[in-house]
Amino acid sequence: MERFVDAAPGVRLWAEERGAPDAPVLLLVMGAQASGLGWPDELVELLAVRHRVIRYDHRDTGRSTASFDEQPYPLTALAEDAVAVLDAFGVERAHVVGMSMGGMLTQLLVADHPERLLSAAVIGTNALSSTPYVAPDGHRIPPEELPGVSPELMELWSRPVEDRGPEAELERRVEHWRVLGGDLIPFDAVYARELERRTIAHTGHHHAGTAHARADYSGMERTEQLAATGVPTMITSAPAEPVAPAPHAEHLAQVIRGARLVEIPGMGHALPREVHAPLAAAILDHTGRN
């Protein structure tokens, strides 16, 4: 079932739910400039076997309000949007899974709205904490000194985004997914192209968005709250991760109280078919414990 959620004055978000209406709710929070369709249907269906799954379009993505140029917002507003989605669906508490920027938003929910979470799962992001990473040899490394985005991805991101028509934009996105996926799972360009065709059809246009890259990222640190949280949290470790490479997942597991670290074999910073089953199994195991 689809609906629109009034998240804030002048802001409406597209949202969809699948699964049994009386099942525990699982809220999926996607990354920057990604609509709810960033969660592939096949993965959503695996999760909906045991959950009432809700996915939604962030502001300035998909069918949601696109108004950043007129109404700039801080990234923290997107975390409050997630709470508004839960409210609109009448959900008091939910399991929350966030990927990439959505993983940052999930950390904000863990820190600022723990009473709304049954559990949290964080995929492919860095910690919102200033606590140093403790390496296996005991060496303490400040977060800002941990490895960053891969050179190939940085080069791709540095290219100007120009509107050269829908087919050129489609191919740009496919190339982006190739690099994001890493080098351990063979890249399926046909599958990536089909996912992006669905996304473009859902959005109604092919234009690339930049709002989330331009949003205010200040005020995000939650060192003390994450260290003291009681929200059961799972961190996924992806061996081919090019955005937040090792040891970012390990760092997250250290700074979030009681967090568990689970590796998804072959995974990078994308959701190809090959990771659907192991990722769904890890998420369902985690939610089943909580």
Residue ranges and their predicted role:
Residues 229, 235-237:
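Short beta-strand/loop motif that positions the catalytic acidic residue
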Residues 120-163:
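Flexible "cap/lid" loop of the alpha/beta hydrolase fold
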Residues 92-136:
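Conserved hydrolase catalytic core segment
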